[in-house]
């Protein structure tokens, strides 16, 4: 069950007030040996929208204009204006960062979170879909209403950078930019249950 509290602001007279907000996406609980709860490498917050939505086009303008070195992924100017296709599997809450908090001890090979810790990798993902070897209507496997797929067929070089997060203890947390590619290990090879919460 997802719980969301809307980010809200109000104007009272001439003063701006901002209300506290929080967002809990889901809890992940895996038992030793589980091989059913892995997630393939992806980015949340839309897939095909990144090429066709006017706000995403503004966000990625430097990438599409072949000035990818100038792309600033931390400029959030248009990120709260993107429009995603409706889907029960995709969160529609604007998040400046995504997070994972350990509720139990966990680490590599425990079926835990993986990242490609390169924020500007989005430049590779977006432009890769525009190369001649990719069918015009395919966008490297991106599908409406799904997360942005990062796969072996088109992104094998990028996937070499996929690493598991380090050993974490209850209360430890890790945060990543919404353009960072992430996954969950296919199998839990550890000996204890692990529980983590996405925030």
Predicted regions and their residues:
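Double-stranded beta-helix
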Residues: 58, 62-177, 181
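Short beta-strand His + acidic residue motifs that chelate non-heme Fe in jelly-roll/DSBH
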Residues: 182-188
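Extended, Lys/Arg-enriched charged tracts that mediate electrostatic binding to polyanionic substrates
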Residues: 14, 23-83
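Acidic/His-leaning functional-site neighborhoods
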Residues: 127-131, 186, 196
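A short hydrophobic beta-strand segment most commonly corresponding to one strand
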Residues: 117, 190-199
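A short, structural micro-pattern
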Residues: 21, 93-95, 189-191
């Amino acid at each position: 069950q997802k719980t969301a509290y809307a980010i809200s602001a109000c104007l009272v007279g001439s003063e701006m007030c901002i209300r506290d907000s929080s967002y809990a996406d889901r809890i992940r609980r895996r038992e030793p040996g589980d091989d059913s709860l892995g997630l393939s490498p992806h980015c949340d917050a839309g897939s095909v929208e990144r090429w066709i939505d006017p706000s995403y086009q503004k966000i990625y303008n430097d990438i599409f204009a072949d000035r990818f070195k100038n792309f600033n992924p931390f400029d959030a100017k248009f990120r709260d204006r993107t429009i995603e296709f409706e889907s029960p599997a995709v969160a529609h809450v604007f998040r400046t960062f995504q997070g994972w908090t350990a509720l139990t001890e966990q680490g590599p090979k425990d079926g835990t979170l993986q990242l490609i810790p390169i924020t500007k990798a989005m430049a590779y993902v977006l432009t890769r879909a525009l190369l001649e070897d990719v069918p015009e209507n395919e966008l490297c496997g991106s599908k409406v209403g799904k997360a942005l797929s990062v796969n072996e067929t088109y992104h094998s070089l990028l996937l070499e950078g996929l690493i598991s997060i380090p050993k974490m203890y209850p209360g430890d947390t890790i945060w990543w930019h919404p353009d960072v590619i992430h996954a969950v290990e296919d199998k839990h090879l550890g000996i204890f249950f692990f529980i983590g919460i996405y925030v």
